[in-house]
Every structure is written in structure tokens, then in C-alpha cells.
């Protein structure tokens, strides 16, 4: 099930970013809606907001996505870990958002943001991931973000 699908540009970003398009994979409708709203207001393009593995994979295969923000628990038999493995195999950055980060998360994600989190912490986490992807100096790491030393 798609919670919302946004195609095209939202607000223009002030400067070129490593991350412009985000896929939100979240099974809790209120959290999904909040994430989508916060991301759009910050100028990111939300490729889609989905609640299960199958829809996430469809978006990854058919749309340009720079970052996958994935909860661990999803509707259906597969989890956010399965989504992350697929996304990582396609060369995409993954940020887990979960109360309990998977023990092997460093093998498929850039970081894990602990739930519950504030909107500013989600946006700051994306800023940190952008710095990691560009190889630049890291900004302040927000509360609740565990950044992995390496991926894979």
C-alpha cells in the first residue's frame, strides 16, 4: 500500500545535495505521514512512502532514489532489513529508523536513527549522511543517530 506518492519537485534546495530524492519505508501511518511532510518541507523529493517490502522494491527499481529511510518492522513477511539489503545491492544509501537497530545494520546502512526522534533529528541525520557520501567534514551528529564507521 502506498501512503502517498509524490512525483516532481517540491521546494527547490538552496544548494546541490548528495541526497535529493528519498524513499520512506514505514508501516506506522502517522510516522510515515510526518516523515513525508518534514522531508517535503525541507525540500526533498519524496519518491514514495510505502509500508511493505514489495512496494519499496518497486520504487527502488522504477524511480531515482538517493536515500532509503527504512523502519525494521513492515507489513508482510519481509522486513526493512530485506529492503535495506536490496537497496544496498543497488548502491543506495540506507538509514534505519527503529527502536532497535539490527546487529548487522553496518553491513547495509550508513546509520540508524533511534525512535522516537524529532523532525530536526531526522533532517540532521540526512545532513550527516550527505556529508559521509561526499567525504566531507561531518556536522554535529544528532541525538539518537548511530553512524557506522563503514558500510559493507
Where in this protein do the model-derived segments appear?
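Non-catalytic signal-transmission and effector/linker regions of two-component phosphorelay proteins
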Residues: 1-21, 118-152
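Acidic, metal-coordinating helix/loop segments flanking the phosphotransfer/catalytic sites
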Residues: 36-37, 49-67, 75
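Conserved phosphotransfer microenvironments
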Residues: 70-88
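Conserved phosphotransfer cores of two-component systems
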Residues: 61-63, 86-92
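Conserved acidic carboxylate
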Residues: 26
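A Lys-centered signature of the CheY-like receiver
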Residues: 115
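Charged docking surfaces used in two-component/phosphorelay signaling
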Residues: 33-37, 41
Amino acid at each position: 500500500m502506498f501512503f502517498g506518492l509524490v512525483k516532481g519537485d517540491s521546494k527547490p534546495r538552496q544548494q546541490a545535495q548528495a541526497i535529493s530524492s528519498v524513499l520512506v519505508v514505514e508501516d506506522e501511518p502517522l510516522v510515515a505521514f510526518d516523515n513525508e511532510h518534514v522531508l517535503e518541507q525541507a525540500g526533498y523529493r519524496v519518491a514514495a512512502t510505502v509500508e511493505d517490502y514489495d512496494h519499496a522494491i518497486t520504487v527502488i527499481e522504477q524511480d531515482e532514489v538517493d536515500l532509503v529511510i527504512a523502519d525494521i518492522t513492515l507489513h508482510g513477511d519481509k522486513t526493512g532489513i530485506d529492503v535495506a539489503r536490496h537497496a544496498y545491492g543497488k548502491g543506495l544509501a540506507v538509514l534505519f529508523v527503529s527502536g532497535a537497530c539490527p546487529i548487522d545494520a553496518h553491513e547495509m546502512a550508513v546509520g540508524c536513527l533511534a525512535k522516537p526522534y524529532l523532525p530536526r533529528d531526522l533532517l540532521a541525520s540526512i545532513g550527516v549522511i550527505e556529508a559521509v557520501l561526499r567525504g566531507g567534514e561531518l556536522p554535529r551528529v544528532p541525538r539518537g543517530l548511530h553512524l557506522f564507521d563503514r558500510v559493507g
